[in-house]
Amino acid sequence: MPDSALPPCSILLLAGGRGQRMGGRDKGLIEWQGLPLIAHLHRLVRPLTDDLIVSCNRNQERYAAYADRVVSDDSRDFPGPLAGIRAGLAVARHPWLLVLPCDAPRIDRALLETLLQAAGRTPARPWMLRCGGQWEPLFSLIPTHLAEEIEHAWRQGDRSPRHVLLPLGAEAIELAAGDPRLANLNTPELLANHRELK
């Protein structure tokens, strides 16, 4: 059951990319430390929500084992993570949508709780992690009431989550440059380098 001390949130795991850096392989299903990457994220976030959403454009039946709902965006050309965020916002059942990439298995519960606790301070604005001054929009917490504004930006042709969220008054959780919890294991080399790390 979700922690009642934290604001109720839906959680979206983004697994919809082409996997170009992985030679076209579906990143979320690649194994790391004996489990698919998506399984590590599922194990971490499952206690935080009763509305776990996975956005993917292929292998939906396999991802269904790790989600309450599987969604896909409405384009066939892999238009990027904002498409998955739109799909998640469209079905989210709670006032907040916590967005995470499927290829970041080193993120920890403490950091997610910090992000969720921040929501109570400014409930109308999105929150993002900012690592060494660099915004990380795929580690974000978005009020679902902003879905219409995000949809408007999409219709105007904006495909960048950062460009869309910043004008909505995004707040930052500051992290030091190189924080290993945000490591995206999105190439074979990175996957190998982090394979033995706990």
Curated annotation (Swiss-Prot):
GO biological process: bis(molybdopterin guanine dinucleotide)molybdenum biosynthetic process
This protein's encoding gene: mobA
Family: Belongs to the MobA family.
The keyword Magnesium belongs to this UniProt entry's keyword annotation: yes
One Pfam family this sequence matches: NTP_transf_3
Chain's role: Transfers a GMP moiety from GTP to Mo-molybdopterin (Mo-MPT) cofactor (Moco or molybdenum cofactor) to form Mo-molybdopterin guanine dinucleotide (Mo-MGD) cofactor.
Protein name, entry field: Molybdenum cofactor guanylyltransferase
GO MF term (any one): molybdenum cofactor guanylyltransferase activity
Protein residues bound to GTP: 14-16, 27, 73, 103
Binding-site residues for Mg(2+), renumbered to this chain: 103
Domain notes: The N-terminal domain determines nucleotide recognition and specific binding, while the C-terminal domain determines the specific binding to the target protein.
InterPro entries named in the record: MobA-like_NTP_Trfase, Molybde_CF_guanTrfase, Nucleotide-diphossugar_trans
EC numbers for this chain: 2.7.7.77
Source organism of the structure: Pseudomonas aeruginosa (strain ATCC 15692 / DSM 22644 / CIP 104116 / JCM 14847 / LMG 12228 / 1C / PRS 101 / PAO1)
